Each structure stands twice: as C-alpha cells, then as structure tokens.
A protein has these predicted regions:
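Conserved small/polar residues in nucleotide/adenosyl-binding loops
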Residues: 380-384
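Extended active-site neighborhood of metal-dependent phosphoesterases/phosphodiesterases
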Residues: 78-83, 90, 162-247, 270-284, ...
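Binuclear metal-dependent phosphoesterase catalytic core
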Residues: 301-375
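N-terminal active-site segment of His-dependent metallophosphoesterases
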Residues: 22, 29, 90-164
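Acidic carboxylate motifs that coordinate Ca2+ or other divalent cations, activating on Asp/Glu
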Residues: 32
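Short, acidic Ser/Thr/Gly-rich low-complexity loop/linker segments typical of extracellular
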Residues: 35, 51-61
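Short Pro-Gly-centered beta-turn/loop motif in secreted/extracellular proteins
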Residues: 63-71
Length: 384
C-alpha cells in the first residue's frame, strides 16, 4: 500500500503543472479595462489557451484547462468589436483570471457583412527612416474609406524593426484594428525565435471575425532563428478553432508565405495530423515574403501576395498597399493603392477648341488616400 502511494506521488510530481484559467468577456463601455457591474457580458465568444478553444457562457465567463506549452490566453475578436491591441493576455505565474473588455466597432462593417481591409507586408524598417508618409497614407485611406482592419503579414524586421513598428501602427493610433503576422526575419535571437515578437505583438497564431468571414493568422514555419512553436502546435489549435465556426463560414488565412502551389490547401504537421482547409470554405491565402504583387486562382482558392508599400517590389512594381473589398459571402475583389501620391494631377491630352468653343482637356489624377471623384478647375483667359 505504501509503495503504491509513493508511486502515485512520484507520477504526479513528474507530470507538468497546469492550472485552469477563468475570466470574462464583456463590453467595456467606459473603456477603463475593468469589468463593472453595469457592463454587458458577451456570450459565445471564443477563447483559447493556444490549444483548447471554448466559448463564453451567458454571463460572459469562461474556463480553460491550460496545457503544457501554454503562453497566452486570447480571444477570437468578434465582428463589431475591437480591442486596443489586447485580444490576448500573457499567462503570468500566480494569476489564473483573465478578463477581456471589448469596444463596440460596427460602423465600418455594413449590415450585410460586407467590408474592406488593408493588407501590407515586408515593411522591413530596421534600416530605413522617414516612415511618416506611407504610414499616413494607410491611416488616411483607412479612415476615408472605412477599412474594417489592417493586417501586416510579417517581416517587420529584426530587433530594431520589431521594437519600432508597433509605435508606427497600432489599433489606437491608426483608429482601426491592426493585426500582425510573424515573418522569417521576425524570428530573432532569444530563448526562442519568437520571444521578442511575442513580448510586443502577442501570440503568433490567433483568429478574429469581420463581417461574415473568419480570419486566421498563422506563423511562418521557420526563419532566421528557430521558433519555439511547431507545426503540431499550430495544427492542434487550428483544428479546435475551426471546430467552433458555423459550417459554411468563409475563411481567410494570413501567413508570411504561401502554403502550397497546389489546388488543395492542406496544413500538415508531424504528429498532429493535417487539415484540408478547402473543406472549411477557404476563400484566400493572403501572404507577403516574395516582395511582389501577385494573385492566382489555385482551384477554388485565391493566393494573394502583396509587395512592400514603402520600397516597391523586386519585380520593379511601384510602392503600394492592397485593399480587399469583401462581400457578404466572403468573395472579394482586390485593388492596389499607390503610396506617396498626394492629390497628383497632370494634363494628359489637351485638344484643339471645338466648334462650340469648348476646350476639352483630359487629365490624370490620383490620391493615395482615396479615390478621386472630381477635379474643380478654373481657367484664365490668355490673349495672344
């Protein structure tokens, strides 16, 4: 009996210590970051510990079991809400409670779920300066055209870039939700490659909803320094995340690189199986890495690559950010918006005076921050 008891104690001691985590998701009406009794709890919000995914109860509460490789508690930010870059909490020792206050944010998503978002990639600001012009272009376009969110698909770049970029573009100073992916040059020296990224930008995989679409952020498989996460980690979480969406929900995946050149998008792992993303109504795989502007239909899925908006592409494409116009079914059209052009106008083809006395003049006009609808013109009569 004593031997049995001793063996049980040894087995328990050898097992990893994991704790249950609890919390609440609520509407932070006064934006103080604290749940007040008068504030509305939110039910049905997905919450994860990086492996397990649960949904909040009617009172906004949740309980997660935790797991051996846990680092964050994070939510799937629901459509119509935003956080100030706080869709996650780092798991701290001796802390088991984690609340999430959400702020209503519905004006930029139409009633039928259609919306637009901005995609940027490969800004690589570690060795460049004077970023204000292109950042302002993105901010002003997002405001003028009511973009639902901005996504950066990685290569921010190296320690200097990682520390600086969050100050350039975040949900608060862009007045628009800003999300980040990790790229190969964002895996830097540390205990593990993503340590610095996590300390600034949070988890390397997570999801959020906008309109009728479920958006999933996934990490670059590898890079300059070995990551602490594995394809097994991502695959296990991804299966659980997808298990909580309504069948037929349109899905878009963001990553720094393209998953496959084939028509079937299968996320593979070593020990956790695989996922055929085509079976989950995958609409697009959106990425960067190649420094080109390129879109291709692979079977039923579009792969969409966007180049650098501050430097241009290695294919000599000009500087631009991409705008995705998404309809109620998750289908989309794509548009490139060229940066550094502030209300540019150029006479293209002045012609001779018509019999009626009218002088037709064709002009080329462009603005980085909005489409041009009209150009007021005044004429001065010049005598010969």
């Amino acid at each position: 009996m004593k031997k049995t008891f001793l063996l049980s104690c040894l087995m328990l001691a050898a097992m990893p210590v994991m704790a249950a985590y609890t919390g609440r998701v609520y509407v932070d009406k006064n934006k103080n970051g604290v749940f007040d009794q008068s504030e509305k709890p939110l039910a049905g919000i997905k919450v994860s510990d990086g492996l397990n995914v649960v949904e909040t109860a009617a009172d906004g509460s949740f309980t997660l079991p935790g797991h051996e490789r846990e680092r964050f508690i994070f939510i799937t930010t629901p459509s119509g809400y935003k956080t100030f870059n706080r869709h996650y909490h780092k798991i701290e020792k001796k802390q088991s409670g984690y609340d999430f206050g959400l702020i209503p944010y519905s004006g930029r998503i139409r009633k039928n779920g259609s919306h637009r978002y901005i995609h940027i990639a490969d800004t690589e600001i570690f060795n460049t300066e004077n970023h204000a012009d292109w950042v302002n272009n993105v901010r002003d376009y997002a405001r003028n055209e009511q973009a639902a969110f901005i996504i950066h698909t990685g290569d921010i770049c190296y320690e200097k870039g990682l520390k600086a970029h969050i100050k350039l573009m975040n949900t608060e100073n862009m007045d628009c939700p800003v999300f980040y992916c990790i790229g190969n040059h964002d895996l830097v020296k540390g205990k593990y490659g993503e340590e610095l990224f996590e300390s600034i930008y949070g988890p390397v995989y997570y999801s959020f909803d906008a309109g009728n679409v479920h958006y999933i952020v996934t990490p670059m498989p590898g890079g300059d320094h070995a990551p602490g996460y594995t394809a097994d980690d991502v695959c296990r979480w991804l299966k659980n995340d997808l298990a909580h969406i309504r069948p037929g929900t349109p899905v878009v995946v963001f990553n720094h690189d393209l998953l496959t050149y084939e028509d079937t998008f299968i996320f593979k792992s070593k020990n956790a199986g695989s996922i055929n993303l085509n079976e989950y109504n995958l609409k697009a795989w959106v990425y960067g890495h190649w420094h080109i502007n390129y879109m291709k239909k692979q079977g039923d899925v579009y792969s969409v690559c966007t180049s650098s908006l501050d430097k241009g592409g290695i294919d000599h494409s000009t500087t631009a950010f991409r705008v995705m116009h998404v309809d109620s079914k998750g289908d989309f059209t794509s548009e490139l918006r060229y940066t550094y052009l502030d209300k540019n106008i150029c006479i293209a083809s002045p012609a001779g005076v018509m019999a009626s006395g009218v002088l037709p003049v064709a002009v080329n006009v462009y603005s980085s921050v909005s489409p041009v609808k009209e150009v007021p013109v005044s004429y001065t009569h010049l005598r010969a």
